């Protein structure tokens, strides 16, 4: 995978144990307003994904997905600016796609189609749908992996930035 795509789509590894996350004591930021219409990506793939997911998810779950986006966007712009130093637009587009699809596997229709966990089912569904919408393979795979691992925190190894962000932001976005 080209190095540029690694940065653009949130692939760089971070510690799975979250040792890279600022503590409450060290995170000295003031509250910020997040204007959704200003921070939400407007690319064709995001528009297609948003329409698809909005029609597939219950309203509460869809709204949860949008809240997760806002929390994660704020976390990155306040505490992880290095993550977006070279590819801000692409990173947040990928982030929006991960947020939209992260619970797609929880619907009764999608749970009834498989014996896999909702994370795996949703990840694979997102991979297939995003590629059909024209997302680059590396971007669709980043979203897929983040969804598969979003309920899998741990103490050892690493996870992609996108995966870690989904884990953390979903904890706030309930």
PLM features per residue range, with description:
Residues 58-66, 109-121, 136:
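Active-site metal-coordination segments of metallo-dependent hydrolases
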Residues 60, 84-92, 114, 135-139, ...:
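Short, surface-exposed helix-loop/turn micro-motifs enriched in polar/charged residues
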Residues 79-83, 126-139:
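Inter-helical turn/loop segments and adjacent helix faces that build the functional surface
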Residues 3-107:
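Acidic/His-rich, divalent-metal-binding segments that scaffold phosphate/diphosphate chemistry
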């Amino acid at each position: 995978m080209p190095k540029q795509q690694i940065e653009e789509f949130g692939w760089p590894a971070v510690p799975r144990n979250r040792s890279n996350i600022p503590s409450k004591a060290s995170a000295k930021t003031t509250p910020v307003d997040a204007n959704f219409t200003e921070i939400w990506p407007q690319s064709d793939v995001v528009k297609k994904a948003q329409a698809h997911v909005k029609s597939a998810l219950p309203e509460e779950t869809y709204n949860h997905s949008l809240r997760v986006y806002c929390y994660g966007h704020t976390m990155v712009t306040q505490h992880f600016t290095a993550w977006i130093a070279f590819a801000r637009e692409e990173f947040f587009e990928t982030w929006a796609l991960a947020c939209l699809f992260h619970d797609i596997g929880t619907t009764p229709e999608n749970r009834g189609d498989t014996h896999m966990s909702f994370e795996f089912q949703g990840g694979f569904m997102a991979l297939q749908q995003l590629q059909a919408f024209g997302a680059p393979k590396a971007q669709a795979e980043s979203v897929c992996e983040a969804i598969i691992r979003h309920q899998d925190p741990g103490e050892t190894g690493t996870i992609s930035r996108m995966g870690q962000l989904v884990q953390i932001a979903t904890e706030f976005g309930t």
